[in-house]
């Protein structure tokens, strides 16, 4: 996938718990370990990782799907927002979380893919695994 990627991980929680945490300020901050401001409403802006990540929520399907216009402070000013789709699917030992992240600046996809692993998936496994 040019300027994007798809990645999945199983998190030890049900889809509703992950959905709620992703879309609430307290939950997002707790599951990542870094300050966030998030709303569970379409059209609302969000920030995460102390403002490094920011954007707007575009589509929501409760407990199943989140779509956001997404960027970081490292994006070139003239670059359009990327598109993040989060799919939540119940599996035997938790929820399969699949991220499809497209429209990233050229040559940045591998760095952002690793960032999702290090700064989201690892802390989410720890948080929900308690």
Task: List the model feature ranges, each with a label.
Residues 29, 33-36, 47, 51-96, ...:
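Hydrophobic-ligand binding "helix-grip"
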Residues 1-37:
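Hydrophobic ligand-binding cavity/cleft-lining segments
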Residues 11, 101-103:
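Hydrophobic beta-strand positions in extracellular immunoglobulin-like domains
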Residues 6, 13, 44-49, 111:
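Alpha-helical scaffold segments that form or flank carboxylate-/histidine-based iron centers
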Residues 103-130:
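A conserved amphipathic terminal alpha-helix motif
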């Amino acid at each position: 996938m040019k300027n994007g990627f798809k990645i999945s991980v199983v998190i030890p929680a049900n889809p509703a718990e992950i959905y709620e945490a992703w879309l609430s300020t307290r939950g997002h901050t707790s599951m990542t370990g870094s300050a966030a401001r998030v709303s569970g409403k379409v059209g609302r802006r969000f920030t995460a990782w102390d403002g490094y990540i920011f954007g707007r929520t575009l589509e929501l399907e409760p407990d199943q799907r989140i779509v956001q216009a997404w960027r970081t402070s490292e994006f070139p000013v003239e670059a359009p927002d990327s598109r993040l789709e989060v799919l939540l699917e119940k599996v035997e030992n938790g929820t399969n979380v699949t991220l499809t992240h497209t429209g990233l600046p050229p040559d940045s996809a591998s760095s952002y893919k690793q960032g999702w692993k290090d700064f989201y998936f690892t802390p989410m496994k720890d948080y929900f695994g308690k």
